[in-house]
Amino acid sequence: PYTYTDNSVSVKYNDHGYDPWNYDAAFILDHNGYVTEFDINGETRWRYEYENGYVSKKQENNSVTTPYFWTYRWENGNLMEQRDSYSNSTTYTYTDKPNKLNINLFDAQFGLGNFGIFAYVVFLPTNFKGSIPSNYPASADNSNIYYEYDDEGYPTQIVGPNANYILTYY
């Protein structure tokens, strides 16, 4: 069950019946509906900054890596590069097909990047503003993603590194 307030979306996560897989997760939103931080059990894990409506920086807050962060570069609504504190980077390419699904296929898919900008977005019914690309992803660095499409341009199959997904629409 999700709990919604004016400035947050929360969920109680319960997996495997034991700690550390049981916790309360919350996305804190600004007045425009953008995620500004992600909390677990009331402790801030990540903070987000935006530029022109897109995530420009994600900072991880924990005792081991603080301040560890990722920066993001966007073009025409598509994430083109992410770079971390240690100058490691991932570059992305896209198909020429418009993204009709209104989801980010990179987030928590294929094990690419750092599991997406919003790594815990799987808790939520949709992606947040500033994380959905305009076109379908085609690659992350040298890991290519291939699609089969139906007559209306929706993907019916996605094949990527160690992945083969058949998509069904209801």
What does each model-identified segment do?
Residues 1-170:
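Buried hydrophobic residues that stabilize the cores of well-folded domains
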